[in-house]
Amino acid sequence: MIALIQRVAHARVDVDQRCTGAIERGVLALIGVQPGDGEPQRRRMLELLLGYRIFEDEGGRMNRSLSDIQGGLLLVPQFTLAADTRSGLRPSFSTAAPPTLGREQFNLLLQEAKTRRSTVESGEFGAHMRVALLNDGPVTFWLQS
């Protein structure tokens, strides 16, 4: 499982001109599912999403996590993160999970996140989405579990 996370001042995702999720200060996480991803990868990814220290403390050091600051989490499915880009000028998606597995794993990650955080929002698997954000930093990390 892959996540591209960004520290944001605010973010939102729209599907068909309808807001499906919006957060204030927190983390926007684009999520890619790979073949073989299951409960161990989901559990680890959720630990990383909630515990990765990307928010500043009083001294200006990145020493606080999403859980520490009680921030929002916006999860957006993005299968293109799992693309194979090693050759040619066109990505191959053979390294991404099939849609049924991707949807299942994304939805389970979303459900599990909602049991641990009060502010969890999401995009819609398989939909064309428009994501708007105000990046804070910018601070962006690639996480893999």
Q: For the regions a protein language model found, what residue spans apply to each?
A:
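A charged helix-plus-loop insertion that forms the helical arch/lid used to bind
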Residues: 87-97
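N-terminal, polar/charged subdomain of small-to-medium soluble alpha/beta proteins
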Residues: 1-89, 104-145
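Extracellular glycan-recognition regions
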Residues: 101
